Structures are given as C-alpha cells and as structure tokens.
C-alpha cells in the first residue's frame, strides 16, 4: 500500500508480508500489526499502539505504545522512530 490512510480498530493484524510506504494511521487505531510477520512499514506521523508484531520493521515519527503480552508469538520486529 502506498500513501494510504489506515483507520479502524486493530488494523493490519494477522498479515504476512505487508508493505506500507508513506502511509498514515488514524489516531483511533489501536493494537496495530497484532500477530503480523515480515512487516515492511514506513509510516508518516504517529501510530497510537502496536501490539505483538512478530517480525519485520516498522518506522514512524512517533509510537504511543508498544505492547507484547503473554500471547506474543515472537519479538523480532524492529520498531524505530524517525
């Protein structure tokens, strides 16, 4: 997905190989990328919450919260701020 706006509750969960380029997230989005793997995401702006991503990389200007709970299937995702 290129230059798209993501909205909704728990978006982009259970995905494999998702590519996001210059996308934005609505502030109401929470628990993004849960159980997703091989993520390649370049986000413009902020992500409210990322929950239990398995692997890949997520870059954003701001991340409000990163959650790994007891149900996390992996912790190999690299989350960076720009």
Where are these regions (language model features)?
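Residue-level detector of solvent-exposed, low-hydrophobicity positions
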Residues: 18-19, 32, 75-78
């Amino acid at each position: 997905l290129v230059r798209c706006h993501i909205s909704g509750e728990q978006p982009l969960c259970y995905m494999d190989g998702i590519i996001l380029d210059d996308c934005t997230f609505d502030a109401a989005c929470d628990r993004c990328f849960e159980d997703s793997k091989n993520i390649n995401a370049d986000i413009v702006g902020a992500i409210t919450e990322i929950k239990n991503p398995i692997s890949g990389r997520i870059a954003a200007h701001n991340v409000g919260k990163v959650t790994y709970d007891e149900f996390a299937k992996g912790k190999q995702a690299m989350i960076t701020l720009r």
